[in-house]
A protein has these predicted regions:
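Structural preference for solvent-exposed beta-strand-turn elements
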Residues: 1-145
Length: 145
């Protein structure tokens, strides 16, 4: 079981970031999804067995848990919701209820145990870049082209 609420814009941004590495088609259905882990905050991970992205977003977590949702379906649903707080709740069978304003959706998730473990990057080799730094690098790249 899992329950949290989060601003739609923050959630949509995190989904967009993590979805960049999700496999479009895979023999492993979980790889077409995003791993959602609710603890003190919400962590969303995308992985295609070669590249992975993990991003964290501020959320009001009522009940901790984790599950996998199809990235395309989840992203489309959140994108179509009104700009308000999204309330996410999942039961023990991974049935997810999403509500935001007048919009309500029910979708079936997958168990987090179906999701492959992302490799751990050692601190000696990791890179941490603030989002603003990435925006500047993107601008510089466009300027140089």
């Amino acid at each position: 079981m899992m329950k949290f609420s989060c601003e739609k814009a923050l959630l949509q941004n995190a989904i967009n970031i993590a979805s960049r590495t999700v496999a479009q088609k895979s023999s492993i259905p979980a790889l077409e999804g995003l791993l959602l882990q609710a603890g003190s905050d919400l962590t969303i991970s995308g992985y295609n067995m070669q590249t992975g992205i993990r991003t964290t977003v501020s959320a009001d977590v009522v009940e901790s848990g984790e599950l996998v949702l199809n990235a395309r379906l989840f992203g489309d649903i959140i994108r179509k919701m009104p700009d308000d707080v999204v309330v996410f709740s999942a039961d023990a069978r991974n049935m997810v209820h999403l509500s935001c304003g007048d919009a309500d959706f029910d979708i079936l998730g997958l168990s987090a145990t179906d999701y492959p473990e992302l490799p751990v990057v050692e601190d000696d080799y990791g890179v941490a870049i603030q989002q603003k730094g990435l925006e500047i690098l993107g601008f510089m790249r466009k300027f140089c082209d």
